Regions:
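Juxtamembrane "helix-exit" motif on the non-cytosolic side of transmembrane helices
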Residues: 58-70, 122-132
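Alpha-helical transmembrane segments in multipass membrane proteins, preferentially the mid-helix core
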Residues: 23-30, 93-94, 147-166
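Aromatic-anchored segments of alpha-helical transmembrane domains
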Residues: 50-59, 113-125, 175-187
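Membrane-interface transmembrane-helix boundary segments in multi-pass integral membrane proteins
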Residues: 4-19, 171, 177, 192-235
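Membrane-proximal helix-loop-helix units in multi-pass membrane proteins
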Residues: 98-156
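Non-cytosolic membrane-interface motifs at loop->transmembrane helix junctions
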Residues: 69-83, 130-143
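Hydrophobic core of alpha-helical transmembrane segments in multi-pass integral membrane proteins
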Residues: 14-33, 47-59, 179-183, 228-240
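Membrane-interface helix-boundary motifs at transmembrane edges
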Residues: 31-44, 99-107, 158-169
């Protein structure tokens, strides 16, 4: 099974990234010109499929001895595996945003889901690198994140959301509300069912930029205050790129 081994920036890994990009293009081509209701049903259906796949993936982790040894010395805890992180919370935010046509939610998912999922695909933790894609732990990790990239980008390619700088304040508000909500869930779980709960990494994380933030503001939740500034800069850059692309498409051929 070595030929299916997934290591960042090696053959199978690069092929997976290529297939992810191809899936975005294929969905666009298949649904281009189709009624909005059909496009909506399709995207929501893909999201629900991914949510079911995510549930199966997490169930497989509860039976994975290597994963449990690495992350749960006191035993597996499903309450630390819920889809409430910055990336996988979009498993249900994307279909909710499409169903309600909520630009704040769709905007958040468009900007955050592909970025967060792509970072997970490009820079996996050691236990998710160098193993066969046929292992449930590896298959679930890479495929669920790849589909998140596809669904997040499809919000734009299928016409549900076009990046607009006027949306950014509302998206930042959505981000803030989700972060506070995640922290409250962390507090509740730490007092009851899951002492290590750390959704949205509100208690810090061994990630370079987050460790830097913690050194600046060593307080749970509050240490992430610089994050909205970085997110805003990223969103404004994407909006500017989108506007340039739109102008190029609208320009008459000379």
């Amino acid at each position: 099974m070595n030929e299916f081994s997934i290591t960042p920036f090696r053959g199978p890994h690069l092929l997976l990234l290529l297939l992810t990009a191809a899936a975005v293009l294929l969905i666009f081509l298949l649904l281009r010109g189709k009624p909005e209701a059909r496009r909506s049903r399709y995207l929501i259906g893909v999201c629900f499929f991914n949510l079911a796949l995510f549930a199966g993936y997490k169930l497989s982790l509860s039976l994975d001895a290597a994963y449990i040894r690495a992350y749960y010395p006191n035993g597996f805890n499903i309450f630390n595996e819920l889809p409430l992180h910055l990336c996988n919370i979009n498993l249900f935010l994307i279909p909710l945003g499409v169903w309600k046509r909520n630009r704040s939610i769709m905007g958040f998912s468009f900007f955050v889901a592909p970025l967060g999922a792509l970072m997970a695909l490009l820079f996996p933790e050691p236990l998710f690198s160098g193993f066969s894609l046929l292992m449930p732990r590896i298959f679930g990790y890479y495929v669920t994140h790849a589909i998140l990239v596809v669904c997040g980008l499809s919000l734009a390619t299928l016409g549900f959301y076009r990046p607009d700088p006027r949306d950014i304040p509302r998206i930042l508000k959505t981000f803030g509300l989700l972060a506070v909500g995640a922290h409250l869930i962390n507090l509740l779980l730490r007092l009851t069912l899951c002492p290590e709960a750390n959704y949205f990494f509100t208690y810090g994380a061994e990630i370079g930029v987050l460790k830097l933030f913690w050194r600046i503001i060593p307080a749970p939740l509050l240490y992430g205050l610089p994050a909205p500034l970085i997110l805003a800069g990223y969103m404004y850059a994407v909006c500017a790129l989108s506007r340039l692309t739109q102008r190029a498409e609208e320009a008459p051929f000379s």
